[in-house]
From Swiss-Prot:
Chain positions covered by the region annotation Disordered: 1-45
Biased segments, Basic and acidic residues type: 12-22
Residue ranges with Acidic residues bias: 1-11
One GO cellular component, as annotated: cytosol
Assigned protein family: Belongs to the PDCD5 family.
Compositional bias segments (type: Low complexity): 32-45
Sections of the chain in a coiled coil: none
Pfam families: dsDNA_bind
Descriptive protein name: DNA-binding protein rrnAC3180
One Gene Ontology molecular-function label: DNA binding
Superkingdom of origin organism: Archaea
Length: 114
């Protein structure tokens, strides 16, 4: 009969240990999430400071259609701003130039029917 209480105690200890592990993992995830949110907020602040309204609209349009290209452009603008190579704000024409540099020329295909 002495085995039954020890099994209950073991089960209780297991539950406590599992709860502790879950709390630790949850705490780390929250810390990473908070850091990501802070980094995203800083990136948005830099973009808002260095892009005109037209350039920001164009960037948002690109992000909607091609998210990877939009992220590349954002990273490029942030890098340029942090290195001090941006004079004034980037307008829509400069944004078009950045887009044309980072996106390869689209290939056209001619389909001929016989």
């Amino acid at each position: 009969m002495s085995g039954d209480p020890s099994e209950e105690e073991l089960e209780e200890l297991r539950k406590k240990k599992m709860e502790q592990l879950k709390e630790q993992q949850g705490g780390e995830g929250e810390g990473q999430e908070a850091a990501q949110q802070q980094a995203e907020a800083q990136k948005q602040a830099v973009l808002k400071q260095n892009l005109t309204d037209g350039a920001r609209k164009r960037l948002n349009t690109v992000k909607m259609s091609k998210p990877q290209v939009g992220e590349q452009i954002e990273q490029q603008v942030v890098a340029l701003a942090r290195s001090g190579r941006v004079q004034g704000q980037i307008d829509e024409d400069q944004m078009k130039e950045l887009l044309s540099e980072l996106t390869p020329d689209s290939k056209s295909f001619d389909i001929k029917r016989r």
